[in-house]
UniProtKB/Swiss-Prot annotation:
It catalyses: 5-[(5-phospho-1-deoxy-D-ribulos-1-ylimino)methylamino]-1-(5-phospho-beta-D-ribosyl)imidazole-4-carboxamide + L-glutamine = D-erythro-1-(imidazol-4-yl)glycerol 3-phosphate + 5-amino-1-(5-phospho-beta-D-ribosyl)imidazole-4-carboxamide + L-glutamate + H(+). IGPS catalyzes the conversion of PRFAR and glutamine to IGP, AICAR and glutamate. The HisF subunit catalyzes the cyclization activity that produces IGP and AICAR from PRFAR using the ammonia provided by the HisH subunit. It is an enzyme of class 4 (lyase). Its main location: cytoplasm. InterPro entries: Aldolase_TIM, His_biosynth, HisF, IGPS_HisA/HisF, RibuloseP-bd_barrel. Heterodimer of HisH and HisF. It comes from Chromohalobacter salexigens (strain ATCC BAA-138 / DSM 3043 / CIP 106854 / NCIMB 13768 / 1H11). The active site is at 12, 131. GO terms for biological process: L-histidine biosynthetic process. CDD domains: HisF. This is Imidazole glycerol phosphate synthase subunit HisF. Pathway: Amino-acid biosynthesis; L-histidine biosynthesis; L-histidine from 5-phospho-alpha-D-ribose 1-diphosphate: step 5/9.
Length: 257
């Protein structure tokens, strides 16, 4: 039997509130993180991802107390990201109740950190977040580049090559966000999702751009993603997690219903 695909609602947290922006700016309030997480746990989400979206930009660690509160209320895997720069940061988050940590900016500035983290804590709890933006012109061979600091800083790194390198260093999972699609509701960037899913042996989580349930199906069927991450469509009540799971199952995708 194929492994069930996962639906992961994402809590982008800024100043203690769940928010949602378009292309990482233009913020809209979506509620209290603990309450939002509880709702998704009750609805049957497979996992929850908590991203402290100001952590890397403003240079501060993720809110440990909030992670503890969420972990105390949800009984599904919790991934925490934002400002994770050292093994001490990882230990702090795992002790607070996170099951996995997501490393983004620090993976670029210090790739060996990914190796060190995987050696110390195990690949199964190390997620590398890849924020990719298309840099090729229309008609050219598609090419995507890695951006850091919440999508503000270009790195010159090729996204597909970078994904391979991160897996070689020990990443157990990749959280791939299309910066071009984030918040647009235009659907995942299937091109980069498929390119990275085909290039690596670990699960790829597709993120950025979900506007309807067909986009979730496409992420798995066309993009080759193992999991799909979304925020707005769930936060603002357009769809519930059970709606999404049923729809994906009806389209022939193995789901935990």
């Amino acid at each position: 039997m194929a492994l069930a695909k996962r639906i992961i609602p994402c809590l982008d947290v800024d100043a203690g509130r769940v928010v949602k922006g378009v292309n990482f700016v233009g913020i809209r309030d979506a509620g209290d993180p603990v309450e939002v997480a509880k709702r998704y746990n009750q609805q049957g989400a497979d996992e929850i991802t908590f991203l402290d979206i100001t952590a890397s930009v403003e240079d501060r660690g993720t809110t440990v107390e909030m992670v503890e509160r969420i972990a105390g209320e949800v009984f599904i895997p919790l991934t925490v990201g934002g400002g994770i720069r050292t093994c001490d940061d990882i230990r702090t988050m795992l002790n607070a109740g996170a099951d996995k940590v997501s490393i983004n900016t620090a993976a670029v500035t210090h790739p060996e950190f990914v190796h060190e983290a995987a050696e110390r804590f195990g690949s199964q709890c190390i997620v590398v977040a890849i924020d990719a933006k298309r840099v090729s012109a229309e008609g050219e061979t598609p090419r995507w580049e890695i951006f850091t600091h919440g999508g503000r800083t270009p790195t010159g790194l090729d996204a597909v090559e970078w994904a391979r390198k991160m897996v070689d260093l020990g990443a157990g999972e990749l959280l791939l966000t299309s910066m071009d699609r984030d918040g647009t509701k235009a659907g995942f960037d299937i091109g980069v999702t498929r390119a990275i899913a085909d290039a690596v042996s670990v699960p790829v989580i597709a993120s950025g751009g979900v506007g309807d349930l067909d986009h979730l199906v496409a992420g798995v069927k066309e993009g080759g993603a193992d999991a799909v991450l979304a925020a707005s469509i769930f936060h603002f009540g357009e769809y519930t997690i059970p709606d999404a799971k049923r729809y994906m199952a009806e389209h022939g995708i193995e789901m935990r219903l």
